Structure formats: C-alpha cells, structure tokens
C-alpha cells in the first residue's frame, strides 16, 4: 500500500469569517472526513492540518487572564495540535471501516537565525476590521497586516528543517494507523530543544514530512480546485499538469497559492514523485488526473 501525505486547507476546519466555536469546527470536519476516510482505505495516510484561527484564539484566551504570564506561542501551537487532532480523530474514527486513527504531537526544527523572525508574515487568529488596527497593536503589541478586505495578526513563519518525530509517524503508518501529525505546521523548536515563538507553514511542513518518510505522493488541499492561469479573468484556465519549473512563477503569487506551489515543487524536485493541488471535495478526481493540478518531473 502506498503512503500519501495530505495537507488540509483551512476551510476543512473553519470557513472564513465563521465564529471560532467547537460546533462550527465539528460541522466543517464532518463534511471533510468522508473523503479522507475513503482515501484511508486505499493508502497509508498521514494528515497535516493548519491552525491559524485556532492558535490565534488560544493566544487571545491566553492574554485574557492577567494573573498569569502569557504562555509562549510554541506551547499554544502544541495546544492547537491536541485540540484539532482530537476533533479530527473523533470524527474520522466514527467513519465505517476505518483503520486506527492516531494524533502525534509533532516537533519541527527551525533555525533561530531564520530571516522570517525579522519580517513576520504568517496570519493567525480571527479577522478584524481595518479600523481596529491601531487599538489592537496598542493593546497587545501585535503586528497586523491586511488579509484581503480584513485585518489579521501576523507572526514569524520560519522554514521547517527537520521533523523530530518522523520515526514515530513512520512506525504508526507501517502498523496501519491513519496519522494526524505536524498539525499547524508542527511545534517550532531550535536545535538546542528550545521552543520558538513562531508558526510554521503547514504546507511546507507537509512537504518536509513527505520527503522524510519517503511518501509516494503529496496532496495539498485548498479552497481553489486547481492552479489557474490568468486567475480572475475571462481567460482563466485550470492547469491539469505541470512541472515545478513551469509552476515557478506561481510560487511568488500573493495569498495561499504561493506557499502551496513552493511546497509541492520542493517535494517533487527532492523525491521525483508526484504531488497534487486541488479541492477536498474532488480529491479522488484530483488523484485520477480528472481535476486539480498534478505536479511531476
């Protein structure tokens, strides 16, 4: 049986602008898990998820209790792995004919000298109105940036260098478990074992995981159903197949597609195995080449 790493897009957990409630997240997860369950019957499956809204919510709750010094961001990332991993595992385990589902708290090494620490760009937390920027920055010391028509907090997002718990993940996959891992991009730690105040991009973490465990494929699930040429124009066209070199211009795109393309291209170049970008609702068609975008050499 082949091994597949799947990175869930943010809409699998929470729709943009939705309240960060457990009920909303369970409802979205319930829509996502049937397709993942079908995959789990055909592949050894490792599932990576994001945590941007959730870790931002934990940070807000963390700041609300003034009697205790706020917990560092790496600890909050670990908390979000447990929260989201539990919700996914509960929902997946309830599917018929499911193999065992296990969540692995995953640490990923980053460099303390990564330039990302000087220029925070990773969005976390809920969306705010632009007119709230000054008050939020003054109250919490946050850095804020525009995310479409909204405003969100940004934190450092260093490059992942090594997944420290990959052996445990491999062992569980070989034993037939569906493994939820590298949640929120993994808990960032430096080579001396210290936690780092950052959030790693989950697609880059998924690509690194696929490389380290020698997976047979990598799937990045997004809000868009493929990579498009001339996006947003009457001439837009879905790209069904491309090489990493052909997709290179898209790696510089604004929004989430840039990191998506960077992640899959790095994996394909490193391992020579295929990767896909597509929508969760069409994941089986994407793997069959009937939807989404396949990236290969």
UniProtKB/Swiss-Prot annotation:
Listed InterPro entries: AceGlu_kinase-like_sf, Asp/Glu/Uridylate_kinase, Carb_kinase
Alphabetical keyword list = ATP-binding, Cytoplasm, Kinase, Nucleotide-binding, Transferase
Q: What are the temperature characteristics of this protein's activity?
A: Optimum temperature is 28 degrees Celsius. Activity is twice as high at 28 degrees Celsius than at 37 degrees Celsius.
Q: Which reaction does it catalyse?
A: hydrogencarbonate + NH4(+) + ATP = carbamoyl phosphate + ADP + H2O + H(+); carbamate + ATP = carbamoyl phosphate + ADP; hydrogencarbonate + NH4(+) = carbamate + H2O + H(+)
The pathway this protein participates in, as annotated, is: Nitrogen metabolism; (S)-allantoin degradation
- Positions the record marks as coiled coil are none
A GO cellular component term found in this entry reads: cytosol
Output one GO BP term. arginine deiminase pathway
Name what induces it: Cotranscribed with allF, allG and allH genes, which encode the oxamate carbamoyltransferase. Expressed under allantoin degradation conditions.
Q: What is the pH dependence described in this protein's record?
A: There is no significant difference at pH 6, 7 and 8.
Cite the EC number: 2.7.2.2
Provide the family line.
Answer: Belongs to the carbamate kinase family.
NCBIfam families on file = arcC, PRK09411.1, PRK12354.1
- What function does the entry list? Kinase involved in the anaerobic nitrogen utilization via the assimilation of allantoin. Catalyzes the transfer of a phosphate group from carbamoyl phosphate to ADP to produce ATP and leave carbamate, which spontaneously hydrolyzes to ammonia and hydrogencarbonate.
Q: What is this protein called?
A: Carbamate kinase
Organism annotation: Escherichia coli (strain K12)
Q: Which gene encodes it?
A: allK
């Amino acid at each position: 049986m082949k091994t597949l790493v799947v990175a869930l897009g943010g809409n699998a957990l929470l729709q943009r602008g939705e309240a960060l409630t457990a009920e909303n997240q369970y409802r979205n997860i319930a829509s996502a898990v049937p397709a993942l369950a079908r995959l789990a019957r055909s592949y050894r499956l490792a599932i990576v998820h994001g945590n941007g809204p959730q870790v931002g919510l934990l940070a807000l709750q963390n700041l609300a209790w003034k009697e205790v010094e706020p917990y560092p961001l790496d600890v909050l990332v670990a908390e979000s792995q447990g929260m989201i991993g539990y919700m996914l595992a509960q929902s997946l385990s309830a599917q018929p004919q499911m193999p065992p589902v296990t969540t692995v708290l995953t640490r990923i090494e980053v460099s303390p000298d990564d330039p990302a620490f000087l220029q925070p760009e990773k969005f976390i937390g809920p969306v705010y109105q632009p007119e709230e920027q000054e008050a939020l920055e003054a109250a919490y010391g946050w850095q804020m940036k525009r995310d479409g028509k909204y405003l969100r907090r940004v934190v450092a997002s260093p490059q992942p260098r090594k997944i420290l718990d990959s052996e445990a993940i491999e062992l569980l996959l070989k034993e037939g478990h569906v493994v939820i891992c590298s949640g929120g991009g993994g808990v960032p730690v430096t080579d001396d074992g210290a936690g780092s105040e950052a959030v790693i991009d989950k697609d880059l973490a998924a690509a690194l995981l696929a490389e380290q465990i020698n997976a047979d494929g990598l799937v990045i699930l997004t809000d868009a159903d493929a990579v498009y040429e001339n996006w947003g124009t009457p001439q837009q066209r879905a790209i069904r197949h491309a090489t990493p070199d052909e997709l290179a211009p898209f790696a510089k795109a604004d929004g989430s597609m840039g990191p998506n393309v960077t992640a899959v291209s790095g994996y394909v170049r490193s391992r020579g195995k295929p990767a896909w970008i597509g929508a969760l609702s069409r994941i089986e068609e994407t793997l069959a080449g009937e939807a989404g975008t396949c990236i290969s050499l």
